[in-house]
């Protein structure tokens, strides 16, 4: 894995999980 590429995406996805209660990818 490229830390620079995956690190930012994973952080964004984790942040979205807080809002994405339905798990459908939309807030």
UniProtKB/Swiss-Prot annotation:
Binding sites annotated in the UniProt record for Ca(2+): 20, 22, 24
InterPro entries, alphabetized: EF-hand-dom_pair, EF_hand_dom
Cited Gene3D superfamilies: EF-hand
Domain of life: Eukaryota
Pfam family name, one: EF-hand_1
UniProt GO molecular function: calcium ion binding
Domain EF-hand: 7-27
Signal peptide interval: none
UniProt keywords, alphabetically: Calcium, Metal-binding, Repeat
Family: Belongs to the calmodulin family.
Protein function: Calmodulin mediates the control of a large number of enzymes, ion channels and other proteins by Ca(2+). Among the enzymes to be stimulated by the calmodulin-Ca(2+) complex are a number of protein kinases and phosphatases.
Name this polypeptide is given: Calmodulin
């Amino acid at each position: 894995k490229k830390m620079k590429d995956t690190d930012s995406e994973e952080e964004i996805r984790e942040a979205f999980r807080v809002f994405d209660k339905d798990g459908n990818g939309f807030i």
